[in-house]
Amino acid sequence: MIGRLAGAGGAVVLAILFAGCGIGASHEIVTFPPTSVGPAATVSAAVLQTRALIAAALAPLQIQLADAKDPFRPGESPRVAAAPRAVYQAVLPADPQGGQIVVYEFRDAGAAVDAGNELAGYLGTGAGRIQFPDDARWTIRQVGTTLVFYTWAPSTSPDPGSPKIADALATLGIGFTPPR
């Protein structure tokens, strides 16, 4: 009797498992958004204005600002990851892969401040820190409705211009400091 119940129970379990893989299962393929390469085809006026401010801040250092040619997406907090972005690159002769500056856009200045605080807090957590070298230096600046994010590390940034970019960006808008 117990053998029949066990056999019937096993058949019911198998039927449920197979039913879950059948018609009721989702056929949609889960995809992820592509990584950012340079600014979007249509960049807003706020992002263009922030780009102009960044270029002006870098000009005295004789560092040019270009559209990024390679995909780049740094570690981001959820609010920042969901925001529209444009990626630019400060041209560094000794570090052609470095100098990426990301400009995120938000609906208003308050939302940009909230996102800046969230990003700074995120970078202070284990989940945020593990995505960067131990000696990473972050620059987070709110400029109007945009948020500017730049990171560099002495251990991985061979160009002497890397810290100068951070210093130049520190002259823009309002800053946020991640906890150490």
Roles of regions detected by a PLM:
Residues 1-10:
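Bacterial N-terminal signal peptides that target proteins for export
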Residues 17-20:
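C-terminal motif of bacterial Sec signal peptides marking the signal peptidase cleavage site
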Residues 22-25:
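Bacterial signal peptide processing site
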Residues 28-41, 124-180:
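A short, solvent-exposed beta-edge/loop patch
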Residues 49, 110-114, 156-161:
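Short, conserved charged micro-motifs
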Residues 49-64:
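Amphipathic alpha-helical segments
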Residues 60, 65-99:
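Secretory pathway targeting signatures of secreted, lumenal, and periplasmic proteins
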Residues 94-114:
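A short acidic-to-branched-hydrophobic micro-motif
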